[in-house]
Every structure is written in C-alpha cells, then in structure tokens.
A protein has these predicted regions:
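A solvent-exposed interaction/effector surface
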Residues: 1-218
Length: 218
C-alpha cells in the first residue's frame, strides 16, 4: 500500500477541531512564491498550483521512468499547503485578497534529494509544456505551533483563529507570526468537489511561551 502522509502523520494532518499544540519537525517541500488574489482566474496563484502538481506527480511517477531515486517508495502525493501573509495589513483583511503574499507548497518525501528535484522540474517543464522554473526546493522548520481543524469557507477562518488565540492566552502562549514564521494552511478538501461549508482546512500558527514579566507590566 502506498505511503500516505495524512495517515502516517495524523498529528500534523488530522488535528481536532479543538486547538492543540504540536511541534512540527523540519520538512522539505516543492515551493512557489507569489503575490495576489488566490481566486483570480488563471492568476499567479493558480499557475503556481499547476507547477507544484506537475513537479509532484513527476516525482511520484519517477519509478516508471528512466530516473532511479535512491530510497524511493510509492506514496500518495501530500495535500496542497500554503504559507500566507499580507503587506501593509494588521491581522488579516479578507476583503483585500490582492495584498496576499504566499508560498504555495507540497511536501516532499525525505528520499527526494536536490538533484532529483532539479530533474523533476526539468522533466515536468518538458513533458507538460509548462514553465516550472519558479519551483524551488525549500526546507521549513516550523517548530512549536498551535493548530486546529477548520470546517467551512476560507472567509470564515477568523472564527477558528479566534479559538486558537483564546486557547493560547488560557495556556500561557502567544502567537509568534513574523516574516519568517507564517500563517499556515493545509487543504484537505477539493474545493471543486466539496461544498464550501464542508471544506476541511488545517490552520497552524507559530507560537512561543508568553513572558509573564512582560504581561505583568501592562
């Protein structure tokens, strides 16, 4: 049976609706960076997703090509994920999606080395007639985070984020979102096949322990 990240790492891909704390180990990803409204038809985000899947499936099917990847085993392509921030916005303003800056990613199995990745980018570009040069091999070390399963539309995410923030305050933690540690979403549902109110999205935020001295001084 093919290895499935969602089943093997349930603590990362199948959290409960109730917020919880998780330490996320470093992982390698196919990544494409960009900016703009993710809903724009044929926009930068949708093009990035096409590149990600082209490279991801080239690697997945490499055992049926002349390429031999050391340590390869059959696996299910992991779900699409995204790291998000907004320029010039305090918090999140869902009414201004054009200001979103994002890193769209798909996780890589550990056996994929840099040269294997470069081969997949070249091969996908040639076979799919798609410019995949924007794809990069990216290692992300998220560390300590709070996460929860959000069920519903993307625009209703603030409800789940509010629950996460309340959980942090009640347990002595605070958000540690910065240019290097970003709001993270993992998309477990196909929006083309799932009703908006049934979409399942993992929401994850980087955190740190609160400073009691700082809190007491305010």
């Amino acid at each position: 049976m093919a290895f499935d990240f969602k089943k093997e790492y349930k603590e990362l891909y199948q959290p409960k609706d109730k917020p919880g704390i998780v330490t996320v180990p470093p992982a390698n990803y196919i990544a494409v960076r960009g900016k703009g409204d993710p809903n724009e038809l044929d926009g930068a985000y949708q093009r990035a997703v096409s590149v990600l899947y082209a490279v991801a499936y080239t690697l997945k099917m490499s055992h049926k090509s002349d390429r031999r990847i050391e340590g390869f085993f059959e696996y299910v392509v992991p779900p699409l994920e995204g790291f998000w921030r907004q320029e010039g916005v305090s918090g999140v303003d869902y009414s201004d999606k054009s200001s979103f800056c994002w890193i769209s990613v798909i996780r890589l199995p550990d056996f994929v080395a840099g040269e294997d990745f470069e081969w997949a980018v070249r091969t996908a570009s040639q076979k799919k007639k798609l410019d995949c040069s924007a794809a990069e091999f990216l290692t992300i070390d998220e560390g300590m985070c709070v996460q929860a399963m959000h069920t519903g539309t993307f625009d209703s995410e603030p409800e789940t984020v509010s629950k996460m923030d309340r959980f942090l305050r009640e347990n002595g933690y605070e958000n540690d979102i910065s240019d290097n540690r970003l709001h993270h979403e993992i998309y477990l549902s196909d929006p083309n096949k799932t009703a908006p109110d049934k979409l399942r999205t993992v929401i994850r935020h980087p955190i740190r322990k609160s400073d009691p001295n700082q809190a007491g001084g305010n």
